[in-house]
Regions:
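Short hydrophobic beta-strand element within catalytic cores of glycosyltransferases
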Residues: 350-353
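An aromatic- and histidine-rich active-site surface loop
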Residues: 95-104, 118-138
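Conserved acidic donor-binding segment of nucleotide-sugar-dependent glycosyltransferases
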Residues: 365-376, 383-388
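Short beta-strand->alpha-helix junction loop in the catalytic core
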Residues: 150, 180-181, 197-218, 291
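A conserved mid-protein helix/loop that constitutes part of the nucleotide-sugar donor-binding site
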Residues: 15-22, 233-261, 291-297
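A short, active-site helix/loop in glycosyltransferases that binds the activated sugar's phosphate group
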Residues: 128-129, 170-198, 207
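Aromatic "clamp/platform" in nucleotide-sugar-dependent glycosyltransferases that forms part
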Residues: 314, 333
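A charged, aromatic-enriched C-terminal amphipathic alpha-helix characteristic of glycosyltransferases
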Residues: 15, 389-420, 424-435
Length: 444
């Protein structure tokens, strides 16, 4: 039986979008009907998302969600009240009205058709989690992804995630992108009163191997080539310029290493232990953009690193930089399972990454060196690796990684029983879902 998968993803150009595209590419269209819900007005207003949209595989069917959902006044009141006070409502009548609104929207989009699986791939907006969960109330298996350490995301950036957490009990699977991340989120969200129990699953990100390897063969940007010509060692990092990506600490680490270099150039040394830490003529290329770009530029100037740290901006093809650098550094304060780390290991680039659950697992599967997140810790890890490069290099079997990740993904979004019965022609009718609205109070 060819199974129908219904996804929603925002297609913001980041690691989540890269992993999503790789997953779609890996799904065999002879086995799966792959469908993606989009909002046309959102795409029209965001050219960067349009670029991701154009990269969708040809076998993906696009379903538009036009206009606004029809609603009754008391239903809309419940939806608005939940947005303001997600932990306050536990009555059956409240949740009956809430779900009536979203179930009607599922029928507006797909009519009476019910997909085998409905997946909210982003996992950050309660509106989309609610819509996906509403298909579950009609018979779909439903999933919501976790791409990061959600307690950190909630405390540091997105207080509205409390609404998403409250809705976890209304999907069948909460899918973290690594086993370690699943353990972290299960434990930390329990401290917030969110019980995930057996609902918490994991499935690692996939990688578009061909795109990475072919992309790395293209010419590198002139600014990166100039940086390599002027420095003995060139580092790179990739990611949006935001607090949790911790690029500021990496920039300060480069300053520390170059300060040592300057001290050495003026001092011939006397062979004592204090002179043993030889300085490095080191440069850094940062790929990405974001709200902290101005702050990072100012920090580069204040540290006297103009000409040594180059901001390359958002790149459609960052792989010549990633493959051409001596070392990829991922200094994040919290992460899920970063696609950039997979890409670096696929290209054979040496890796230093902060000691976080997702990073730790990937380095165990492949190679690399873990570090702390302070400028001093990062500088020490960089110096160790550049003086002994083999410590951060190794072999990563990306084909095996992708095969295992796809199996885990299908197991999570379809359910192990459905996956193991893939070859059967006749399936029992979709199971009826009992209302779980009353359970909201148990996890609030």
């Amino acid at each position: 039986k060819r199974r129908t998968l219904l996804f929603h993803a925002s297609m913001i150009p980041n690691g989540i979008a890269s992993a999503f595209l790789a997953l779609l590419e890996a799904l065999d269209p002879s086995l799966y009907s792959v469908n993606l819900i989009v909002e046309p007005f959102v795409l029209r207003g965001n050219k960067d998302r349009q670029e991701i949209f154009r990269r969708l595989p040809r076998h993906v069917h696009v379903i538009c969600k036009p206009g606004a959902a029809p609603w009754r006044i008391h239903e809309r009141s419940c939806v608005n009240n939940f947005a303001r006070h997600p932990d306050a409502y536990t009555s059956q009548s409240f949740w009956d009205a809430y779900w009536a609104y979203y179930e009607r929207e599922t029928r507006r989009i797909l009519g009476d058709f019910v997909p085998d699986a409905a997946i909210e791939y982003d996992g950050y907006a309660e509106t989309w989690v609610s819509l996906i969960a509403a298909w579950g109330r009609r018979g779909s298996r439903t999933s919501c992804y976790q791409h990061n350490q959600m307690d950190n995301e909630y405390r540091d950036k997105y207080p509205n995630l409390r609404r998403v957490f409250t809705l976890y009990s209304d999907v069948d699977a909460v899918v973290a992108v690594s086993p370690g991340l699943a353990r972290h989120n299960r434990t930390r969200l329990a401290e917030l009163g969110i019980g995930l129990s057996l609902r918490q699953l994991s499935a690692r990100n996939l990688l578009d191997i061909e795109r990475v390897r072919l992309g790395a063969q293209a010419p590198a940007p002139d600014a990166f080539t100039a940086l390599k010509d002027e420095h003995d060692f060139v580092l790179t990092t990739m990611g949006r310029m935001s607090m949790e990506k911790n690029q500021a600490a990496l920039i300060e680490a480069v300053a520390l290493l170059r300060e040592q270099d300057g001290a050495r150039s003026d001092d011939p040394g006397d062979g004592t232990e204090d002179d043993s830490a030889q300085g490095l003529n080191i440069g850094l290329a940062i790929v990405g953009s974001g709200v902290l770009e101005g702050t990072l530029r100012a920090r580069i100037d204040s540290l006297g690193l103009a000409g040594h740290v180059t901001l390359l901006g958002q790149m459609d093809n960052p792989f010549p930089v990633l493959g051409g650098a001596d070392l990829f550094v991922l200094p994040s304060l919290h992460e899920g399972q970063p696609v950039t780390l997979l890409e670096a290991m696929t290209l054979g680039t040496a890796v230093v990454a902060s000691d976080l659950p997702g990073n730790r697992e990937l380095i165990t599967l492949g190679y690399g060196v873990l570090s702390g997140t302070s400028p001093q810790d990062i500088a020490q890890a960089i110096r160790t690796v550049l003086t002994d490069p083999f410590r951060a290099r190794g072999i990563f079997d990306v084909q095996e990684h992708n095969a295992r990740s796809l199996r885990d993904t299908l197991d999570a979004v379809l359910g192990s029983e459905a996956l193991h019965q893939q070859s059967k022609e006749d399936e029992a009718s979709p199971r009826s879902r009992c209302s779980r609205a009353a359970s909201q109070g148990a996890i609030a």
